């Protein structure tokens, strides 16, 4: 399954970009990043179907890493070919995008800078795929 991160803003050569790259290199699933301008630009349609869309949103569900992995594993096993992860700019997502998403998730109750959220998402995607592969990286409790 392709993991497609669609993010507002250019990450450039920042410390966050180094973290994203570090985790992206470890992910054995397909990986793609599309950067959009902070304002304007349209979210591209899925490259593959069937697909799922996950919007990173402060109002979203707070999942454990194992719960997140289970969702991705279920989608993969159901034949989903692409999961798109949408990260908004400073003002987040509009209501239409939230409503069209298959899942809204949040990394806790705090609000995170979108560049840091991208690095956190990359780590959680690595963790989820490692859980599904039976890799010892993740430890519960």
Swiss-Prot record:
Source superkingdom: Bacteria
Keyword Transmembrane: no
Keyword S-adenosyl-L-methionine: yes
Enzyme Commission numbers on file: 2.1.1.177
Subcellular localization, as worded in the UniProt entry: Cytoplasm
Catalytic activity, reaction form: pseudouridine(1915) in 23S rRNA + S-adenosyl-L-methionine = N(3)-methylpseudouridine(1915) in 23S rRNA + S-adenosyl-L-homocysteine + H(+)
Binding site for S-adenosyl-L-methionine: 88
Gene Ontology CC annotations of this record: cytoplasm
GO terms assigned for molecular function: rRNA (pseudouridine-N3-)-methyltransferase activity
Record keywords, A-Z: Cytoplasm, Methyltransferase, rRNA processing, S-adenosyl-L-methionine, Transferase
Listed InterPro entries: Alpha/beta_knot_MTases, RlmH-like, tRNA_m1G_MTases_N
Annotated function: Specifically methylates the pseudouridine at position 1915 (m3Psi1915) in 23S rRNA.
Similarity annotation: Belongs to the RNA methyltransferase RlmH family.
Description of how the protein assembles with itself and partners: Homodimer.
PANTHER family: METHYLTRANSFERASE, RIBOSOMAL RNA LARGE SUBUNIT METHYLTRANSFERASE H
Protein name (Swiss-Prot/TrEMBL): Ribosomal RNA large subunit methyltransferase H
Source organism: Novosphingobium aromaticivorans (strain ATCC 700278 / DSM 12444 / CCUG 56034 / CIP 105152 / NBRC 16084 / F199)
Gene this protein is translated from: rlmH
């Amino acid at each position: 399954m392709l993991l497609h991160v669609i993010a507002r803003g250019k990450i450039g050569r920042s410390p966050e970009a180094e973290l994203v790259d570090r985790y992206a290199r470890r992910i054995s699933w397909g990986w793609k990043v599309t950067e959009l301008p902070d304002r304007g630009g349209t979210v591209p349609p899925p490259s593959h179907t069937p697909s799922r869309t996950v919007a990173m949103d402060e109002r979203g569900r707070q999942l454990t890493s194992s719960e997140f992995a289970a969702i991705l594993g279920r989608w993969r096993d159901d034949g989903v070919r692409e999961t798109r992860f949408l990260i908004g700019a400073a003002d987040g997502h509009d209501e239409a995008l939230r409503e069209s998403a298959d899942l809204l998730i949040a990394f806790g109750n705090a609000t995170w800078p979108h560049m840091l959220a991208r690095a956190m998402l990359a780590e959680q995607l690595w963790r989820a795929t490692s859980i599904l592969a039976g890799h010892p990286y993740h430890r519960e409790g």
